[in-house]
A protein has these predicted regions:
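Short, Asp-centered acidic motifs that coordinate Mg2+ and/or phosphate
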Residues: 27, 62, 142
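Beta-loop-alpha module in the N-terminal Rossmann-like domain of NAD(P)-dependent dehydrogenases
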Residues: 13, 43-104
């Protein structure tokens, strides 16, 4: 495996590919000579490459790309054209058009294209999926997600493109359906061209919706999702290492007054709270192992190019709504909007 990018995320990929029994890091590429030299001291077995072109001369089976999103299409296209399987950091590409191009190229070359949506391989998210699939919560009413912190500011994308891919990929994986439309509002304080605070609302129809709050300006770090159902509700607090998931037997019961269509009796139910046992494990290790297994077995990745494309479509629609001050965007229109700045 070759890894392109040794900045923030690349070293994590290199560490996990090195630990995986089915992979070996044979090459590392980065344009920063000092950074490349430093990572090379930790992984002397890997050939150090100053460019992607130099890396493509090394015998490889696959490449992982951990570079800014604006470079994903060019780098992934070059690797797929060279006959390599590709794992690319989220989001898949900077536009719907670029994402569609990569999905088509991977299919044409018959190569695995996988997006590193790490949460889909985390034990808490897998546990939530089991709970939802078993009907523990009843009919899902709404999902609230808060993903806020002070930073880290990105130079090439806004806060929606930086943080919302986590939530959008989680919703895609857990719900198995796409929203009918979305709206987004936000503003940029550090830069007028990049929103650093944003709110995204997704309408799934049948009185189901999801609300996402993403923020680079919060004094507090919060990583929390609430799944509210007709029977029970679930809270996922990523920062709670011991009990990240809590299921609440709390809710309401509505008894319509038969004498008037305008009157209803609302009752409140308070029951037990329980937390499933979640085995601690590094999700990124599961990502690289899954990538290797898909290559060896010819299988479709859990977070394949199609899922990555669906996420990019939603991001593009959110940008369209942001640029129009929160107008609701049907997703067939949002898919056509392909600028990743707002």
């Amino acid at each position: 495996v070759g890894v392109i990018g040794a900045g923030y995320w690349g070293p994590n990929l290199i560490r996990n590919f090195t630990a995986c029994p089915h992979t070996e890091v044979a090459a590392i590429a980065d344009a920063d000579a000092d950074r490349l030299r430093a990572i090379g001291e930790r992984y002397p077995q890997a050939r150090l490459c100053a460019s992607v072109e130099e890396m493509l001369a090394v015998p490889l089976d696959a490449v992982a790309i951990a570079t800014p999103v604006s470079t994903h299409h060019r780098l992934a296209s070059a690797c797929l054209d060279a006959g390599l399987h590709v794992l690319v950091e989220k989001p898949l590409a900077a536009s719907v058009e670029e994402a569609e191009s990569l999905v088509a190229l991977a299919a044409e070359r018959r190569r695995v294209l996988m997006v590193d949506h790490t949460y889909l391989f985390s034990n808490p998210i897998l546990a939530i999926k089991r709970i939802l699939d078993q009907g523990e919560l009843g009919d899902l009413h709404y999902i609230d997600s808060v993903r806020i912190n002070l930073g880290l500011f990105q130079h090439d994308v806004n806060v929606v493109w930086d943080l919302a891919p986590h939530d959008l990929s989680i919703l895609d994986f857990l719900l198995g359906t796409q929203p009918l439309s979305l709206s987004a509002q936000g503003c940029g304080h550090a830069s007028p061209t990049h929103a650093d605070v944003a709110y995204v609302n997704l309408d799934y129809g049948d009185q189901r919706m999801a609300n996402l709050h993403v923020n680079w300006l919060s004094p507090l770090k919060i990583r929390q999702m609430i799944f509210a159902g007709s029977r029970k509700s679930l809270v996922f607090n990523e920062l709670n290492a011991t009990e990240p998931i809590k299921v609440y037997d709390r809710g309401i019961s509505v008894d319509p007054d038969p004498s008037s269509v305008w009157r209803q009796k609302v009752g409140y139910r308070t029951g037990d709270i329980w937390s499933p046992n979640i085995e601690p494990a590094e999700a990124l290790q599961a990502v690289v192992s899954h990538f290797a297994d898909c290559i060896r077995q010819g299988a479709t990745p859990r977070s394949d190019g199609q899922l990555g494309l669906r996420v990019v479509r939603l991001l593009a629609a959110a940008n369209q709504s942001l640029s129009q001050h929160g107008v609701r965007v049907p997703l067939d229109q949002g898919a056509l909007f392909d600028v990743c700045h707002a």
